[in-house]
Amino acid sequence: LCNPLNGNFEKYINDKTILVSCMYVNNETGLILPVEKLAGLIESSGAPALLHIDAVQALGKLPVNVCSLGCDMLTVSAHKINGPKGIGALYVRRGVRVSPLTYGGEQENSLVPGTYNSPACAGFAAALHELGDKDAQHLKNLYGHFVTRAREFDFIHVNIFGEHAPHIINITFDGYLGENVLHYLEEFGIYTSQGSACSSHSKKKSRALAALGADKRTADCSLRISFDFDNTVAEIDEFFKVCAQIPQNLIRCYK
């Protein structure tokens, strides 16, 4: 795991590098990675590496154009745009050969045994069809309102590490353990997360925050907030109404 924003990306690729895989949008911080720049660096290095982009968190929130991104492969998932769970899509640039991970059938271009889940595929297509510019703008409006409200509290800090997607916010409740705040918010029907779902059972410091230079205190006291297309400004106001009571109800673990 490396931070491609720190200027040292080139030292990780050489003539033995066959694949570079990166997120378009980090799922803990909302940070947008400069994937077009990474594609250029790989090409100029002369390395034989293919570039794979995990665009799961970008779909529906940012433009996803495989030509302008310069990728060889790209993956997205339906559930992030209110489509069915368990179905995704893999883009493979013409000329790139992909070998199957499992064998047993040739009917689906010899990539997977069995048959694709046609109803889920249709559901994914329908969800894509329903996406519009107004959805992305709505998320931007929610993000702006959230950041404005957060400035009203001296113990709440929005962690912005660079260019940012509009639907994921990483915030620090200074002095209060993120896990304690998470469970406190749950009592009011407000559900957040500490880190990504992929590492929800890990007690270690977030690798994403560490790579971006966050110290242990910041990582311990941070939560991830994410918005859906159906969230409202009123719900954000309710969130901060509950947060205002944190100093009266929780013990500070850092001074």
Per-range role (PLM):
Residues 1-255:
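Pyridoxal 5′-phosphate
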